[in-house]
């Protein structure tokens, strides 16, 4: 076998801009390492977007106006879910009503599919993403939207983001798919109130604080109901795996090979909760900590297993990990490329480093390629205006810091 030295960084992206064929080592059904020929999906150039109508985007970021439509939105989505088969994007590909690891059998390459990662209450990033989608999509071929979950928690406008997604669903259910994130799955309603098994969980606190408000409570219950049956993974016909987190870790592979049960609760959980290690070859499965990670050989093993089971996977798009540039393509995963994309325009309170203003990303599906990353260069002053309170907490201005120091001296 010929050894291949794979480039890294920008050189890696340049080298992988066209698909290539490589001989790789991968395990066969018996676990024996054997050579395979793998065609590596290409990696399209990143697109920088700075020419949206930012004034129009700003006008759409109106939480009060979104709430005025809340009752109508909630009632319409409740009615849609009451029909048992709401007809969301890819629902027709489910093996049965309970299938949450959907094998998509056909996808028109000429009909655009946009993938939107973690939002965490970022109404500004959502409206910017929708503005780009609407601008770059022909009216004759409406865009399809795939959300990677995590709509709330970490401040921002969690309720309003959720309501806007509800609106998108009721307006055109066949063009919207929600892949559940860990914060979405963690939200539950017990009858006595809302709970969450994740931290931070400020959205469940918000819902409980507003239990006397009928429509906020019904919106929360509706979210729980929607997420309960929404997919955890999509297997696209070109080999792209779409998840929030990752894939079933290696300790589940033997049982999955024997059963073929993609909807095993442990598999569904791993699709949602696992994290990518950017450089490790392998990681021991560890679901008892936040760092339930996988490495690039773990993903290669999963790709081999999925092919055995009739669902070939060659590359993956995911959210979950809040990477520095809001997207990352990991050089270590060159044989089976992985894209992490996050749609955040501001630094979250739990993220201690870097500028407050971020560049959210979304991605456009392209057959036999990693989805193409689009970086939305939201004006910094707009981010600071919309999230003024969060910015004040993250970066108190110099005069306030000086005032605090003077006060400390006066009371010393």
Regions found by a protein language model. Give the residues of each.
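Active-site-proximal loop/helix segment associated with metal-binding centers of metalloenzymes
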Residues: 27, 31-77, 82, 197-219, ...
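N-terminal active-site segment of His-dependent metallophosphoesterases
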Residues: 40-160, 164
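Active-site neighborhood of divalent metal-dependent phosphoester bond hydrolases
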Residues: 111-112, 140-144, 151-241, 248
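Active-site neighborhood of phospho(di)ester-bond hydrolases with catalytic His/Asp-centered motifs
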Residues: 115-117, 144-149, 177-182, 242-243, ...
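Active-site environment of divalent metal-dependent phosphoester hydrolases
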Residues: 120-124, 153-156, 183-189, 235, ...
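Short coil/turn segments at secondary-structure boundaries
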Residues: 127-131, 158-163, 190-194, 254-256, ...
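Binuclear metal-dependent phosphoesterase catalytic core
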Residues: 334-412
């Amino acid at each position: 076998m010929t050894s291949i030295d794979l480039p890294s960084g920008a050189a890696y992206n340049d080298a992988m801009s066209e698909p290539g064929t490589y001989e790789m080592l991968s395990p066969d059904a018996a676990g024996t390492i054997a050579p395979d020929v793998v065609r590596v999906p290409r990696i399209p150039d990143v697109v920088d977007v700075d020419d949206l109508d930012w004034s129009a985007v700003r006008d759409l970021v109106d939480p009060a106006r979104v709430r005025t439509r809340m009752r109508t939105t909630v009632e319409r989505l409740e009615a849609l879910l009451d029909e048992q088969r709401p007809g969301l994007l890819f629902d027709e590909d489910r093996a049965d009503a309970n299938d949450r690891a959907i094998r998509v059998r056909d996808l028109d390459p000429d009909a655009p599919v946009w993938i939107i990662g973690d939002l965490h209450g970022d109404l500004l990033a959502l409206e910017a993403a929708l503005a780009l989608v609407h601008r770059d999509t022909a009216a004759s071929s409406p865009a399809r939207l795939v959300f990677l979950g995590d709509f709330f928690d970490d401040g921002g406008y969690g309720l309003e983001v959720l309501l806007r997604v509800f609106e998108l669903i009721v307006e055109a259910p066949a063009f919207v798919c929600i892949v559940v994130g860990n914060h979405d799955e963690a939200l539950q309603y017990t009858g006595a109130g809302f709970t969450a098994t994740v931290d931070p969980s400020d959205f469940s606190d918000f819902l409980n604080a507003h239990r006397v408000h009928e429509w906020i409570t019904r919106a929360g219950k509706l979210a729980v109901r929607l997420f309960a049956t929404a997919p955890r993974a999509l297997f696209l016909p070109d080999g792209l795996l779409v998840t929030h987190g990752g894939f079933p870790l290696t300790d589940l592979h033997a049982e999955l090979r024997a059963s073929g049960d993609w909807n095993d609760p442990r598999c569904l959980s791993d699709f949602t909760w696992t994290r990518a290690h950017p450089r490790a070859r392998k990681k021991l499965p560890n679901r008892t900590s936040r760092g339930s990670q996988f490495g690039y050989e773990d993903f290669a093993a999963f790709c081999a297993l999925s092919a055995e089971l009739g669902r070939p996977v060659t590359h993956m798009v995911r959210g979950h990990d809040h990477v520095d540039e809001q997207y990352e393509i990991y050089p270590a995963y060159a044989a089976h490329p992985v894209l992490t994309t996050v749609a955040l325009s501001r630094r979250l309170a739990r993220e201690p480093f870097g500028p407050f203003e971020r560049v959210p990303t979304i991605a456009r599906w392209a057959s036999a390629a990693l989805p193409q990353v689009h970086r939305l260069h939201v004006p910094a002053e707009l981010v600071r205006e919309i999230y003024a309170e969060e910015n004040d907490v993250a970066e108190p201005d110099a005069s306030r810091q000086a005032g605090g120091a003077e006060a400390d001296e006066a009371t010393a």
